[in-house]
Amino acid sequence: MPKKKSPGTLAENRKARHDYNIEDTIEAGIVLQGTEIKSIRRGSANLKDSYAQVNRGEMFLNNMHIAPYEEGNRFNHDPRRSRKLLLHKREIAKLGERTREVGYSIVPLKLYLKHGHCKVLLGVARGKKKYDKRQALKEKAVQRDVAREMKARY
């Protein structure tokens, strides 16, 4: 059974937590067009395979898919366009330094509403090796079995 989303959460990148070790998180605003926010509020955003990148002192979110708004007209948005992220200059510089190190990248973890504004939770992540992923799955299965046994006993 899939996990329930917390209130306000519009999209979540659960695969990122499986593929990466998240070392640090930061909240960023996102620049959207009118039809994009309408589509996001309907729940048709997908963070899978998306990443953030520093370009000329600005940060952009690439490869995030937002389905076209159904009631939109011919001026609807491009589903996979690069979207600018709103961060302070020093935060962008700090994240840019971290991603210059080998093996680090910035991945979006969650898309949510906060006081009516759309926010993205970004994670500074280091990729897991294949054996790390297998080990994490084994540990998760053991914890699930222990929880099941404890529930059956009490």
UniProtKB/Swiss-Prot annotation:
Keywords: Cytoplasm, RNA-binding. GO terms for molecular function: RNA binding. It is found in: Cytoplasm. CDD domains: SmpB. InterPro entries: SmpB, SsrA-bd_prot, SsrA-bd_prot_CS. The keyword Cytoplasm applies. GO terms for cellular component: cytosol. SUPFAM superfamilies: Small protein B (SmpB). Pfam families: SmpB (PF01668). GO terms for biological process: trans-translation. Its main location: cytoplasm. Belongs to the SmpB family. Required for rescue of stalled ribosomes mediated by trans-translation. Binds to transfer-messenger RNA (tmRNA), required for stable association of tmRNA with ribosomes. tmRNA and SmpB together mimic tRNA shape, replacing the anticodon stem-loop with SmpB. tmRNA is encoded by the ssrA gene; the 2 termini fold to resemble tRNA(Ala) and it encodes a 'tag peptide', a short internal open reading frame. During trans-translation Ala-aminoacylated tmRNA acts like a tRNA, entering the A-site of stalled ribosomes, displacing the stalled mRNA. This is SsrA-binding protein. The gene is smpB.
